[in-house]
Design a protein with these regions (language model features):
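Phosphate-group recognition and catalysis centered on beta-loop-alpha active-site segments
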Residues: 1-316
């Protein structure tokens, strides 16, 4: 129905026909059009170019994808961790600001049962305190410097609780909450489920874990919460796991066959952690649902603004 053509290719042909019409007839409207034919040609070309530019601009902004396609969603790994200290309030606010679809975070439980946002089981790398999370109480760590390891200007940044993060992110961004059980937890999964219910965020979050038993506990606490099983492999009979609504797969081990098999059973595919354009293009080409990256800006640019402006499109 549409074909690609150079700007103005078909328009002058109309006015060449008009020359013949002018010679054949002497009506007033033909005379006027003939007199202003150059202006009309120029204006027509401008209109066509303008419409085409608007079409391409909207397409590059993702506007034309809405309701038509399901473009790959972008998850900011531990928040916008390329620019801010990971798993902190500034990192999650940064992810929201740059338009990430999701933010990923890690949760653990302290000795007194507080659910905090922290990746490492040991606090030393980001706070300097050489203690395991499960060994300390919330009061012991709530005032620790959790930002200057990244940059001294973030020395006032503290470890956030999951509840604090939910308050910041509610209604602004989806969350992928990775549960990291220590073996000393009191009721980590149950507390996560309660918080999601309290803040009415069960439908805007997915709970993921390397421990399949954690997904079972989440589903038993609240079956409406979506879950994802984290794996570093993409082979084997994973696609029929009862308590997993999706799979989070390490990017270099992802296979197209696994993606196809999982999606045929209604499972979502999340891929981690993708920080290069080359790798991103490869995994997106496999038809995944969600990509996890430290740099959501780079990923958004490649996914939402693909390619260059095309040639002008004229109906034939």
């Amino acid at each position: 129905y549409y074909r690609k053509a150079a700007a103005g290719e078909r328009i002058p042909r109309v006015f060449r026909d008009l020359d013949n019409a002018y010679r054949i007839t002497n009506t007033r409207w033909v005379k006027k059009i003939y007199m202003y034919r150059k202006r009309i040609i120029a204006l027509s070309i401008v209109v066509v170019i303008g419409v085409n530019f608007a079409y391409n601009f909207a397409d590059r902004r993702g506007v034309l994808h809405m309701g038509l396609d399901n473009p790959v969603e972008v998850t900011a790994h531990r928040g916008y961790s390329a620019v801010y200290p990971e798993n902190t309030i500034p990192a999650f606010k940064g992810a929201i600001q740059v338009g990430a679809d999701w933010a990923e975070l890690d949760v653990q439980q302290t000795a007194d049962g507080e659910v905090i946002v922290m990746h490492d089981s040991n606090l030393k790398r980001t706070t300097g305190l050489d203690k395991e999370v499960w060994q300390v109480t919330w009061d012991e760590i709530k005032d620790l410097d959790n930002g200057s390891w990244f940059d001294k200007k973030y020395q006032t940044v503290r470890i956030p609780t999951l509840e604090e993060v939910l308050k910041v992110c509610r209604g602004k961004i989806h969350l992928n909450i990775e549960i990291k059980p220590s073996g000393h937890d009191k009721d980590l999964e149950e507390q996560v489920a309660k918080l999601l219910k309290k803040y009415h965020m069960r439908d805007t979050c997915v709970v993921s874990s390397l421990k399949y038993d954690s997904l079972r506990k989440i589903k038993q606490a609240d079956d409406s919460i979506e879950t994802a099983y984290i794996t570093s492999v993409s082979y084997g009979n994973f696609t029929d796991l009862e308590y997993a609504d999706g799979y989070s797969v390490e990017s270099t081990l992802l296979s197209k066959s696994f993606v196809n098999k999982a999606q045929k059973t209604g499972k979502q595919i999340y891929v981690w952690t993708v920080n290069s354009e080359e790798r991103l293009e490869k995994v997106v080409g496999m038809g995944i649902d969600n990509v996890i990256t430290d740099d959501p800006v780079m990923a958004k640019e490649l996914i939402v603004f693909p390619g260059f402006l095309g040639k002008i499109i004229i109906p034939t």
